[in-house]
Amino acid sequence: MSLIKIKYFIFLTFFIMVSCQDNTEQGIIPKDIMIDILIDMHIYEEAISELPYEKDTLKAIFKMKESEIFESYSVTEEIYRRSYSHYFFNPKELDNIYQVVIDSLSVYQQTKGND
């Protein structure tokens, strides 16, 4: 897949998510940011799982990386958990979020394989 198609896909996804966003919920991470956080978490989770360490060590490494991810998006773990719970109890929204996450991870994996 060409770089132009990937950029177009990401732009289109971002545009759709922003236009559908409902900002009435206070303290809930917007869908587009939640998608980005989940994508980052899944990418790092996969990378960390391939490290040659014990399971407990891998969990600790992921927990540190998770904190860095939250910090990079200026959210706390509490806000993330509250937001995830909100989306969990709104299955259509969560399905939409994860569809974009899955599509984005598929594109990421395809581009990673082409390197």
Could you say what each language-model-derived stretch is?
Residues 21-24:
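Bacterial signal peptide processing site
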Residues 30-48:
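Post-signal peptide N-terminal segment of mature Sec-exported envelope proteins
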Residues 4-11:
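Sec-dependent signal peptide recognition
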Residues 52-115:
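Compact alpha-helical subdomains of small soluble proteins
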Residues 16-19:
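C-terminal motif of bacterial Sec signal peptides marking the signal peptidase cleavage site
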